[in-house]
A protein has these predicted regions:
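Catalytic and substrate-binding clefts that recognize carbohydrates or anionic sugar/phosphate headgroups
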Residues: 1-234, 241-243, 247-249, 254-259, ...
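Conserved, mostly hydrophobic/aromatic
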Residues: 90, 169, 257, 305, ...
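Generic recognition of stable, solvent-exposed alpha-helical segments in well-folded globular domains
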Residues: 164, 213-217, 221, 245-252, ...
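Structural recognition of the beta-strand scaffold that forms the well-ordered cores
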Residues: 170-171, 177-180, 238, 265-269, ...
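Aromatic-lined carbohydrate-binding/catalytic grooves of carbohydrate-active enzymes
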Residues: 231-402
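Aromatic-lined carbohydrate-recognition surfaces of secreted/lumenal glycan-active proteins
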Residues: 237-243, 268-270, 310-323, 387-388, ...
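Alpha-amylase-like alpha-glycosidases and glucanotransferases acting on alpha-linked glucans and related
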Residues: 338-383, 418-458, 520-541
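Catalytic core of carbohydrate-active enzymes
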Residues: 424-428, 433-434, 440-454, 477-487, ...
Length: 664
């Protein structure tokens, strides 16, 4: 502690400097000003007070801070050691204080990454990132007409920072990381060079600090902290999962796709529960059990597919349609979250229909959902996997059984939802055989969710909501401990004339083949959009790349084993293995494990693209041509996206076999 202040040092480098005449910590009070429309939020804050803490004392290693005009408002600060690193604990007992602001220091050339699953920017410098789980929006670029239209239609345009999975954790190029252990709304502000601004809507905050000799070891430390995922099942990585939602015609179409020679290990029918038609498109009937009218023979179809090595996957989310039977069951058992102004169940508007919220703070309700719905209606029925959708919509004016503040429960909800799903699988002893995938997340979801998907991209090449965002999402989420990531092949959102093109389908097929899981989706408006079976060319291309994906399975299995041991993600930024500032901004290509670089075409109209190769000798997967370090212009025809493998890889035999089977 210095006279009139204190410094927080990391390896003799100052991270936080607080002085009476230049306070780095402020406290205050505020009232949230929020509006939610179907998971899209307008977030404002009415700040009623903001006080710099200009008085300092220390008693028994506890620093006390206050403002000279309000000495009764005291903030205590303690530095403790944890198994993972150091923890800076800030507390203010004043009941009216609910805001904290801190300004930490950094070097002017320090780079930052993380923030959960970020769609627009891998490197966070120069921008402000609120952490609040929500719909990411459609368009996500305030300069575009689509975003402006969606904003006008229900706050649904989004922005560069909106994401299903925020996490207040960031990594530094100086090989340290910071995590805010809070579920409250918080903000990372990197708009001012040399400063790291933190805002937290709570008077209680733990700032966890991590250090490591390398960036890879830092990622391992974060994975140790937040939890590891189990290995993906063999069937999930050994072929494509075909998504169809065409009711009685699904199996006919599936057999056509299967007869193309595609390597298929899964059939995913999210409409297994039935359909509800809305102006947005085909929606599902949210009563989570087999709909015999939609799929009359599904109970016989599932074992028949299994005999061919094809698993069946479905869909579930944490809400119950008010006109469904399971809603009535939950209501009868008092398992639903309530309104604040009455004991009536809270009804959430999901766009032309309402649904109830199962209260996962009620342990009996959480167990009921795990056992009664996922266990009995899904796993026992024969499902091997599912999309565990949503988790971002918890209203902030809801009443929960545990009495928790919904402003904080909101961010915790995806984690509770993930645990409900994981518990169901564990209860059947199928943790290594069944799987589910989620788009929503927050700190701690890593311990429960085995597989992320990138959410609802637009079916286009746009900068902030198109195919390219899938790569950024995989890389950013991987840095904070999520080893497995994939996307909806073809994209999802088709609105206001935005529809899939043949070029987009071909490029997404190429991209999906080089992810741990290759899964297609028909999108929100299947009839308006190209599908896998819409043309012989698309189907043949899908069949080819599904076989490439299947042939890569031994390599993916090795990466999965590495992920279990170290927490390293399968898709990695180049800088994770080659710590060079020249690579800190790269977000349109990635290392697939240490031995492969994948550079998909994610811009419209390209027939080639620039690929940055780090040091070493790199073999072009399709031709065998050897390239060295540097930037190379590489041809990128459909079916041969720019992919390179390390010449000295222990997997060279496998890579050579792929070239012999699919190369030119």
């Amino acid at each position: 502690m210095q006279t009139g202040g204190f410094d927080l040092l990391r390896d003799d480098v100052c991270m936080l400097s607080h002085r009476s005449d230049k306070p780095a910590i402020e406290v205050g009070s505020g009232t949230p000003d929020l509006e939610m429309v179907r998971g899209n939020f307008r977030i404002g804050d009415v700040v009623e007070s903001r006080l710099p803490l200009d008085c300092i004392s220390e008693i028994n290693d506890v620093i006390r801070l206050w403002n000279k005009a309000q000495p009764e408002l005291v903030v205590t600060l303690e530095l403790e050691q944890s198994v993972h690193g150091s923890v800076l604990k800030l507390r203010c007992a004043n009941p009216t204080t609910n805001r904290l602001w801190l300004t930490m220091q950094c070097s002017t050339n320090e780079a930052f990454w993380g923030g959960g699953e970020q769609m627009s920017y891998l490197k966070l410098n120069g921008r402000r990132f609120p952490f609040w789980t929500s719909e990411p929006g459609v368009g996500r670029d305030k300069t575009t007409r689509l975003t402006q239209t969606m904003d006008a239609e229900g706050l649904a345009g989004g922005d560069y920072w909106t994401t299903n999975y925020p996490q207040p954790t960031w990594l530094s190029s100086e090989r340290h990381a910071v995590h805010l252990e809070t579920a409250a709304y918080s903000v990372l502000d990197l708009t001012e060079q040399g400063k790291v601004g933190i805002e937290c809507w709570s008077a209680k905050l733990d700032i966890e600090l991590f250090d490591a000799p390398s960036l890879r070891e830092l990622v391992t430390n974060l994975s140790d902290r937040f939890g590891r995922q189990p290995p993906l099942p063999d069937w999930a990585i050994s072929g494509a999962i075909v998504g169809l939602k065409d009711g009685a015609d699904t199996l006919t179409r599936f057999e056509k796709i299967a007869s193309s020679g595609a390597a298929i290990t899964g059939l995913w029918c999210e409409d297994w529960v039935g359909i509800r038609q809305t102006s947005f498109g085909k929606r599902l009937f949210w009563d989570w059990k087999w709909n015999a009218a939609r799929y009359p023979d599904l109970h016989a179809t599932i074992p028949s597919l299994a005999a061919r090595g094809i698993r069946f996957l479905g869909y579930v989310n944490p809400y119950l349609a008010v006109d469904g039977a399971l809603y009535q069951e939950a209501l009868a058992n008092s398992y639903l979250a309530l309104r604040q102004d009455s004991d009536a169940p809270y009804a959430v508007d999901f766009g032309e229909f309402d649904a109830g919220v199962v209260d996962f703070t009620n342990l009996d309700a959480a167990h009921w959902f795990s056992e009664r719905i996922i266990g009995r209606e899904m796993l026992d029925f024969g499902l091997s996997g599912w999309m565990a959708d949503f988790g971002e919509y918890l209203p902030t004016d809801i009443r929960l059984l545990d009495g928790s503040d919904p402003m904080e429960a909101h961010n915790r909800w995806p984690v509770l939802w993930a645990k409900v799903n994981a518990d169901a699988i564990a209860s059947r002893g199928k943790t290594h055989d069944a799987t589910f995938f989620m788009r929503a997340g927050f700190s701690g979801v890593q311990a429960h969710c085995p597989l992320l998907w990138a959410g609802d991209q637009c079916v286009d090449f746009t900068r902030h909501d198109g195919i390219n965002t899938v790569i950024t999402a995989a890389l950013s989420s991987g840095l904070v401990g999520n080893a497995y990531h994939h996307s909806d092949l073809g994209g999802y959102t088709s609105l206001h004339g935005v529809v899939r093109t043949s070029e987009l389908m071909h490029r997404w097929i190429d991209l999906a083949a080089f992810a741990p899981v290759m899964r297609s989706h028909e999108g929100n408006r299947p009839a308006d959009n190209l599908q896998l079976d819409s043309s012989p060319e698309i189907l043949a291309h899908f069949a080819r790349m599904s076989r490439v994906h299947a042939q890569l399975a031994p390599y993916v299995r090795a990466l999965s084993e590495e992920a279990v041991a170290t927490g390293l993600p399968l898709q990695r930024p180049v800088f994770l293995h080659y710590d060079d500032p020249a690579y800190y901004d790269i977000q349109d290509q990635y290392l697939y494990g240490a031995d492969m670089i994948v550079a998909p075409v994610v811009e419209q109209g390209q027939t080639s693209r620039l690929v940055i190769l780090p040091e070493g000798e790199w073999v072009h997967l399709w031709t065998g041509t050897v390239h060295g370090k540097g930037t190379h212009n590489v041809a990128a025809p459909h079916g041969q996206p720019p992919v390179f493998t390390r010449k000295d890889s222990t997997h060279t035999y496998l890579f050579t076999s792929i070239r012999q089977a699919f190369g030119s």
